[in-house]
Swiss-Prot record:
Domain of life: Bacteria
Protein name per its UniProtKB record: UPF0235 protein msl4154
Record-stated family: Belongs to the UPF0235 family.
SMART domains on file: DUF167
Gene3D superfamilies attached to this UniProt entry: YggU-like (3.30.1200.10)
InterPro entries per record: DUF167, YggU-like_sf
Species classification: Bacteria, Pseudomonadati, Pseudomonadota, Alphaproteobacteria, Hyphomicrobiales
Organism, as annotated: Mesorhizobium japonicum (strain LMG 29417 / CECT 9101 / MAFF 303099)
Length: 102
């Protein structure tokens, strides 16, 4: 299974499948879709209105990976379940933290 991320010069892009309106906020590991792409499964309590679920996802990823919330942002898939989250920081260290979640 491939890692659910892409290494960038100044960080990583993390591919996430988000489920809003969950009973709790959590990252649930790596999943592979039918087309063979990997993504990290995430659940948040926030509702998908006015970007609340995206903001909750950004906070959850920042807390889980131990990075400042300001270095995490949803850059693609704002209204979709499948999102790309950009995390600024040391790419190798971030990749290791994500792989440990798998």
């Amino acid at each position: 299974m491939s890692a659910p991320l892409r290494i960038r010069e100044n960080g990583i892009d993390l591919f996430v499948r988000l489920t809003p309106k969950s009973s709790l906020d959590r990252l649930e590991g790596v999943e592979t879709s039918a087309d063979g792409r990997s993504h990290l499964k995430a659940r948040v309590r926030a509702v998908p209105e006015n970007g609340a679920a995206n903001q909750a996802l950004e906070r959850l990823v920042a807390k889980t990976l131990g990075v400042p919330a300001s270095s995490v942002s949803v850059v693609a898939g704002g209204t979709s379940r499948l999102k790309t989250v950009r995390i600024v920081g040391d790419p190798e260290a971030l990749a290791q933290r994500v792989e440990a979640l798998g």
